[in-house]
Regions:
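Conserved, single-site charged/polar hotspot
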Residues: 1-170
Length: 170
């Protein structure tokens, strides 16, 4: 049974690492993790705006593209999207008419996650946008297609640290 197999594996990992901590520069590290990368993990500075952390750098995680959760496509009602964006970011002032002209991805990090996105009159961070709109990842594209807003996300989570899916291949 899958549950028993996973439980046994986790129990073995816990026992094998009992009393151990990870350190960098003689300090206990922050060890973030997430579900599935977009093919690369992210630099902590890009995702969280923290100063560079030597052990939280972008690395390839190509096995993540094999995950069933790697790619997700959703089509949103434009009026609902506009309402959600304006509720989360009132300064945006989005309208349903001509939505493609009001939304622009301004920057991406080296792992292709959105750094900043312009929503009408407001610029917001990719992670902030992801959380406000409940997107699976900040690695996304967004475009009006046939009267709906198509959002394609790659990966699940913030993308910093350990990919849980990728860890299965270690």
């Amino acid at each position: 049974d899958a549950f028993e197999r996973c439980y046994r594996k986790l129990s073995e990992c816990v026992e094998a690492t009992k009393g151990l901590v990870l350190t960098s520069g003689n300090k206990v590290i922050e060890a973030p993790y997430f579900a599935v990368s977009a093919g690369h993990t992210r630099n902590a500075a890009d995702a969280f705006g923290k100063e560079s952390v030597s052990y939280l750098k972008s690395v390839e995680s190509k096995q993540d593209i094999e995950s069933e959760e790697y790619l997700y496509v959703e089509f949103l009602d434009i009026a609902g999207f506009v309402a959600d964006c304006n509720a989360a970011f009132p300064e945006a002032g989005l309208t349903a008419e001509g939505i493609n002209d009001q939304i622009e991805v301004l920057t991406r990090d080296e792992a292709e996650y959105v750094g900043e996105i312009r929503l009408g009159a407001k610029t917001v961070g990719g992670e902030e946008f992801r959380k406000a709109l409940k997107l699976r990842s900040a690695c996304f594209t967004i475009k009006e297609v046939e009267g709906k807003l198509r959002i394609v996300t790659k990966g699940v989570g913030h993308g910093v640290g350990l990919s849980q899916y990728g860890a299965e291949y270690l």
